[in-house]
Amino acid sequence: MPHAASGSRACKGKSHVHDAGTKFGMNDQASRIVIVGAGLAGLACARVLAAAGKQFTLLEASNAVGGRVRTDVVDGFLLDRGFQVFLPAYPEARRVLDYDELDLRPIYRGADVFVKNRFHRMADPLAHPLTAMKNFRDEIVTLRDKWTTLLLRKEVFGLQEPPRDLGDTESEDYLRDFGFSEVMIDRFFRPFFGGIFLEKDLRTSAAMLHFLFAMFDRGGSALPAHGMQSIPNQLAVALPPGSLRLNAPVSGVRAGEVTLDSGEVLHADHVIIAVSEEVAHRLLPQTGAPAPLPSRSTTSLYFATDDLPPGDPILHLDGDGRGPVNSVTVLSRISPHYAPPGQHLISTAIIGSPCSTELEQVVREQMRRWFGETVVAKWRHLRTYQIRHAQPEGRQLKLGAGPLNAMIEPGLYRCGDWCEDVSINGALLSGRRAGEAVMRALGEPSPD
C-alpha cells in the first residue's frame, strides 16, 4: 500500500508511540494486557482500558493507526484509502468521538443518478423539500417508489443497531418484498447500497440495509474536514504515553503470549486480537475456526483539476449499470481541505478490483459520458488504490445470531467489525465490548 500521511494535515494531534525497535517502556514491563491491532476496534478497546487506568501495550504492524481507515497526502491532496463516508448518527461513534474536533462536513442528502445519458437529482424530501418537489414527477422512479421510500423510513425509525429478527434475508429480496420496483432497485438501491456493501447483487443481510438506512435517515453522511484518518487519530491521542508501538507486526498469538515478527515475545494475562478476519485466522489456527470467505474489494481512482463547474457536495451514482465506476464524488466540495487552494479532488469508486492495465482510460471514457469531454480532459490522475480486503464477506451475510463473543477462551479475546457488523460503528462497538470483557475477567466494572 502507499505510504502513510504521517505528520500531514490528515494527521491532526500527536499520539504517544514507540517504534518497534524501541524496547519496552515503563508501561510495557508491568503490562498484563496486549492488544494486537490499532484499527478502530483496537483503539476502542484501548480506550476502555485506559479509562479504567489499566496498563497495556497496543501493537500495530503499520506505521500509523487506523487499520482500513487511513488517509495519505499526495501533492497536497488528502486521499482516503478507498472512498469512505462517515455517518454521524452512529450511536457508538457519538459515544466516543468528539464531532466538533472532527469538524464534520455534511454531504448533500440525496444523489445525482446517471440514467438515460443525463443526471437525475434524487433529493431527500425532508432535507431538500423544494428540490424534491421540483423533481416530483421525474421519470427515474415511480411515485409509488417514492411513497414506499417514506414507508421504509417509518419502518426503520428509531433503530440503534441492526435488527436481529430478519434472519438471513438478503437486501434485494427484502426491498422487492417491501414493494419497491425493479427500476428503483436497479437505479438507486443497487448503486447506492452496492457501493456501501461492495457488492451489487445486494446479497448482504437486510439487517444491515435497515440499520444503515436508519443512520442515513437520522443524520445523513459527512466527512471529517481533514480526512477519514482524523477518526483513529482522535482516539490515539488519548492513549497513555508509551502504550502504542508502531511498526510491530505480530507472527503468532496464544493465550498469555504474543510473538512479534522480530522474534520478541510478550507475555500477558490478557491478549486481545483486533485485526482483520483474515489475519485473525492466520494468527489463531489453534481455534479451529473455518477459513473466512474471500474479502470484498474496492478500487478508487483519484483525479485533480483546477477547473470544475459549480455544484453541490453530492454523490453521483451509476444508475444505468454500465460502469465500471459506481460513484463519483468531488471531495473538495465537501471539505476544501481535501485539495490545495484553487484545486479540486475527485474520487471515482469501483466495486471490486479490476486488473486491467487500461483502467484509467476506461474510467475516463465513462466520465466523459457523465461530465463531458471538456471537463474530463483537465483531470490529472493522482493515484489508484486497490483495497483487496476492504470488507469481510461472511459477517455481511448473517447477522441474525448477534455479535460474536469477545472472549475466545480465558485470557484470549477478539474484536473487529467482522465480530459485530461491518461498519465504523460495528468496529467501535466490538472494541468496547472486548475491553469490557477484559474488565469483567479482572473482576472490575468498566469505566462507562
Give the location of each predicted region:
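Mobile amphipathic helical/loop "lid" adjacent to a hydrophobic cofactor/ligand pocket
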Residues: 23, 93-94, 98, 103-202, ...
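Conserved flavin/dinucleotide-binding core of flavoenzymes
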Residues: 331, 335-448
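Mid-domain catalytic core of redox enzymes
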Residues: 251-361, 365-370
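Glycine-rich FAD pyrophosphate-binding loop
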Residues: 50-74
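Helical element adjacent to the flavin cofactor pocket in flavoenzyme catalytic cores
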Residues: 209-257, 266-270
